[in-house]
């Protein structure tokens, strides 16, 4: 039987992970956070001291890169780098910022493409990211594109960071959101855009509902 896929795309802080996680739980599907996968690569780049703007340096790290994804009894996706649980480490603000640079490299996207598609071949999934409906799973049965005002997305990101015990200022977070939006929209490979057959949802006011 063919597996069912639901693709959820959108910029940082639009509410992708919240919607994807709840949808997967209700349907009994697997939730795949592709952003966590790219952050894991970014963490490897940072730990190796490689220059993220130097494709050759980053590509040299991909050969033999050991990334694994698993799920605990609570259903939370956990990421492993060379056998080490890096689920919390990849959520640091510095790693998130680096992930956007790393994700713009064609070699990285090609390297991770089959890894992501394999999850959807093996089980029913709800997958979120920037290019799920356009590149990773272009034939997904349901496609949703979430968006929200940058200021609202920055507020959500700030709250998330503080809940993790990380100090941050609103202006710095907003600046990072806007910078990442620009990087995601203008990158040469798999830029952030709404799939033609995706349903558009603006979540700006949902926090206040």
Q: Can you annotate each of these PLM segments?
A:
Residues 6-8:
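Hydrophobic anchor at the beta1->P-loop junction of P-loop NTPases
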């Amino acid at each position: 039987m063919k597996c069912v896929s639901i693709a959820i795309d959108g910029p940082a802080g639009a509410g992708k992970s919240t919607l994807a996680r709840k949808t997967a739980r209700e349907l009994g599907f697997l939730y795949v956070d592709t952003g966590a996968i790219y952050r894991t690569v970014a963490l490897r780049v940072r730990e190796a001291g490689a220059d993220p703007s130097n494709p050759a340096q980053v590509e040299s790290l991909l050969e033999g890169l050991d990334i694994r994804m698993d799920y605990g009894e609570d259903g939370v996706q956990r990421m492993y780098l060379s056998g080490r649980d890096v689920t919390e480490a990849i959520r640091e603000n510095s790693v998130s910022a680096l992930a956007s640079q790393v994700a713009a490299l064609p070699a990285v996207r090609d390297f991770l493409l089959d890894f992501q598609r394999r999850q959807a071949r093996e089980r029913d999934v709800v997958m979120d990211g920037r290019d799920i409906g356009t590149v990773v799973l272009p034939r997904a049965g349901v496609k949703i594109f979430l968006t929200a005002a940058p200021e609202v997305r920055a507020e959500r990101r700030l709250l998330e960071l503080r809940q993790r015990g990380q100090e941050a200022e609103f202006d710095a977070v907003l600046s990072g959101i806007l910078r990442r939006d620009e990087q995601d929209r203008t990158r040469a490979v798999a830029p952030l855009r709404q799939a033609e057959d995706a349903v558009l949802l603006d979540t700006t006011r949902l926090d206040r509902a």
